[in-house]
């Protein structure tokens, strides 16, 4: 009943990033416009040497820091030289996340409960894993910020492969059935939530998710909406 990781302990140790140690990596430089869309990019093999480790405690202290304050909270003292970079990263993460929502990404506030009884189910991939929705951006959570950039890198890599006719594995999912979405929409309308419908009286999953954000019943409706979303599956893009 023990969890068996995909990588052996030796490979996991060899591939891990540690502060002050150089490590081989695949890096990407992406230029985004004001709408959060990638305009130019470059993938390359690099050597990465981390200079600091950022914790949720540090990000919480950064979020609570007063603008223009010269005082540095205790949680930020070990990374005081990187505060400016962190603020830039958070700004970029906000812009990318907003761009995802404008492009129709579905946002559900359904974090995995940190219950010991869940065992390995508590662990999810930094980018959200194999699902058709994303969680809200949490500025105090390092993995939430990292997930935004990982999704951007994944999306750019997919577009890169399509542009250059390269074989690649991509995650794809079918659209939810309109009947299932209508059931969630009816529940939202019954709670007097503002909801826009098209000429056929239906709405998209992303628009429905956005309408639920301000609702006190958001979690219950998010759970119902999640049940309408099909799990993505890997598909191989063949080179022609």
Question: Can you annotate each of these PLM segments?
Answer:
Residues 1-240:
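Electropositive polyanion-binding surfaces
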């Amino acid at each position: 009943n023990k969890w068996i990781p995909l990588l052996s302990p030796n490979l996991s140790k060899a591939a891990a990033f540690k502060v002050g140690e150089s490590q081989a990596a695949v890096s990407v430089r992406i230029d985004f416009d004001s709408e959060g869309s990638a305009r130019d990019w470059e993938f390359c093999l690099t050597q990465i040497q981390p200079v600091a480790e950022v914790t949720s405690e540090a990000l919480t202290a950064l979020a609570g820091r007063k603008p223009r304050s010269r005082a540095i909270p205790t949680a930020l003292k070990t990374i005081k030289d990187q505060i400016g970079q962190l603020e830039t990263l958070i700004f970029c993460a906000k812009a990318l996340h907003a761009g995802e929502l404008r492009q129709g990404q579905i946002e559900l506030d359904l974090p995995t409960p940190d219950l010991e009884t869940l065992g390995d189910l508590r662990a999810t991939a930094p980018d959200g894993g194999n699902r058709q929705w994303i969680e809200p951006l949490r500025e105090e959570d390092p993995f939430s910020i990292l997930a935004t950039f990982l999704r951007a890198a994944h999306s750019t890599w997919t577009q890169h492969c399509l542009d250059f006719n390269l074989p690649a594995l991509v995650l794809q999912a079918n659209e939810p059935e309109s009947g299932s979405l209508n059931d969630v929409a009816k529940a939202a309308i019954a709670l007097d939530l503002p909801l826009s419908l098209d000429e056929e009286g239906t709405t998209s999953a992303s628009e429905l998710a956005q309408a639920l954000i301000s609702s006190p019943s958001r979690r219950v409706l998010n759970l119902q909406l999640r049940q309408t979303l099909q799990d993505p599956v890997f598909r191989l893009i063949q080179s022609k």
